[in-house]
Amino acid sequence: VARSKIADAMVNGKAIKNSKLKVGVDPLFGASAGYLRRFLEKSGLKPQSIHSIHENRDIFFGHKTPNAGPDALKELSKLVVKNKLNIGIACNSDADRFGIIDEKGQWVSPNEILALVLEHLIKNKKLTGRVCRSVITSHLIDEVANAHRMQVRETPVGFKHINNLMLTGKYLMGAEETAGLAVSTNIPDRDGILACMLIVEMMAMEKKSFDKIRKDFYKKYPMHYSKKVSLPLTELEIETLMEK
């Protein structure tokens, strides 16, 4: 209940209600099942505007890795394109990370989403504070922070380092390349549901498509490129690499 009230207070329900957005939802059989839809409905979207998949309980997560990456969200991508939805939102199995599919059915890099959310928090929600990000997270966040004269702190790998900074109360946002987002007005930890809701809110408040928001963003900031490659390794291979 407390978590529900916090999330409800974090987004502009009036803007979302008036937007008439059509949203695709994929909890990947995980902890956000039911909650993503509930928050959208409580924010004013009509049930017929919300298209959801994988809300049933499946302890095998559809026999896929439920990490909200491009491979896991192929069905959400098809759903968005088929039904001509404005955006697709998803969470990983324990709902602490997010995944976003644009209106063209393309998966959007977490690095890009994190920078867009920061710009949204500052420009549309008028929030202030410092920003912290892990060492592997894109410096695109620095571009946004510097443009608004906000301090940026780089942390080692591991969200616990960001947690500690968020607990000081001096930081507006904590960001991690692996789709981890923390915002000062919420709990000082990753929250995938809130991250998804902030993207929907951003579109509603700006009254623009995601594609238009992204194009306008890159008129102001330089393009940054990043790519993540996951390699399956045996325990022996991991041990060998760690020794090096």
Task: Locate predicted features.
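Phosphate-binding and adjacent anionic-ligand microenvironments
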Residues: 87, 127-244
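Gly/Ser/Thr-enriched, mixed-charge loops and adjacent short helices
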Residues: 1-81
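Alpha-helix capping and helix-loop boundary segments enriched in small/acidic/polar residues
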Residues: 27, 63-68, 105-109, 132, ...
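Short, acidic/turn-prone active-site loops that include or flank metal/cofactor-
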Residues: 54-58, 112-115, 156-161, 179
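General beta-strand structural signal in soluble alpha/beta enzymes
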Residues: 25, 52-54, 90-91, 100, ...
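Buried hydrophobic positions in well-ordered alpha/beta secondary-structure cores of metabolic enzymes
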Residues: 7-10, 26, 73-77, 89, ...
